Design a protein with these regions (language model features):
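Segments that shape or occlude catalytic/ligand-binding pockets
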Residues: 108
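Bacterial N-terminal signal peptides
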Residues: 12-24
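Alpha-helical and His/Cys-centered functional microenvironments
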Residues: 9-12, 208
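Conserved metal-phosphate-binding beta-hairpin within the catalytic cores
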Residues: 205
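Extracytoplasmic cell-surface/polysaccharide-interacting catalytic and binding patches
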Residues: 28-105, 118-200, 209-229
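Short, well-ordered surface patches within globular domains
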Residues: 111
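N-terminal secretory signal peptides that target proteins for export/translocation
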Residues: 1-8
């Protein structure tokens, strides 16, 4: 009984501390960097484009590098043009009995700020500097992999998602032939549709027109709602 109470206390304390970090990190910088003459956000939900696009939104769970759920729900959005390009990749994969699985898409700026504050200093190359904003904040970056449509399982890759090691590099030469072939297949298909792979993360791709959009901090439940005049 005492052990269970201690576990609940530690869990509750960790969650409370995490919420405090989130609050303080946002207050430390009141909002995202302001940019002029940017296109209005046109974020669309990926699963509404095609029901066979699979979600594995670990930031809505605790099995991510923060150890806490930072999203209130498992949803994924991209700017419309990027989403259409992604759908074309998905349709090409379906011919081989495969499909895209999404780890993350549009990310509110305050979450980028949180990541920056909680990650270790020597691992900050894997997260975006909130002072500059992330392409995820613009709705033009996506973290993804490939899954087998029949089994629902992820196909082998050289590393797991959000693994902060050299194995995460898109040019990593280790691992098995199958893992590297799968990784390179994903990269080839994504680059053919206007995406560029992140040099540190094989799963992270940026869409070509990301500079057209501002750095947003729109909560998921506010996406698509127009402001009243």
């Amino acid at each position: 009984m005492i052990v269970a109470q201690r576990h609940r206390f530690r869990t509750g304390f960790t969650a409370a501390l995490f919420c405090l970090i989130l609050f303080c990190s946002v207050r430390a910088q009141d909002g995202p960097p302001h940019e002029e003459k940017k296109r209005e956000a046109d974020l669309v939900e990926l699963t509404k484009l095609n029901k066979t696009i699979k979600l594995d939104i670990r930031y809505a769970r605790t099995d991510n590098f923060t150890g806490q759920a930072v999203y209130p729900e498992a949803r994924a959005f991209l700017q419309r043009d990027a989403a259409k390009a992604l759908l074309r990749v998905h349709k090409k994969l379906k011919k081989d009995g495969l499909g895209l699985v999404i780890f993350d898409g549009y990310r509110p700026w305050r979450i980028t700020k949180l990541f920056w504050d909680v990650v270790k200093l020597d691992e900050r190359k894997y997260v975006a500097d909130p002072a500059k904003g992330s392409k995820h904040n613009r709705g033009c970056a996506v973290d993804l992999s490939i899954y087998d449509l029949k089994t629902g399982s992820l196909i082998p890759m050289p590393s797991d998602f959000d693994e902060f090691t050299e194995r995460a590099s898109p040019d990593y030469t280790g691992g098995t032939d199958e893992e590297r072939a799968n990784r390179d297949k994903l990269r080839k298909l994504m680059e053919a549709e206007g995406f560029t792979v992140n040099p540190n993360e094989w799963w992270h791709f940026d869409y070509k027109d990301w500079q057209d959009y501002a750095i947003y901090d729109i909560p998921f439940d506010k996406i698509g709602r127009r402001k009243k005049p």
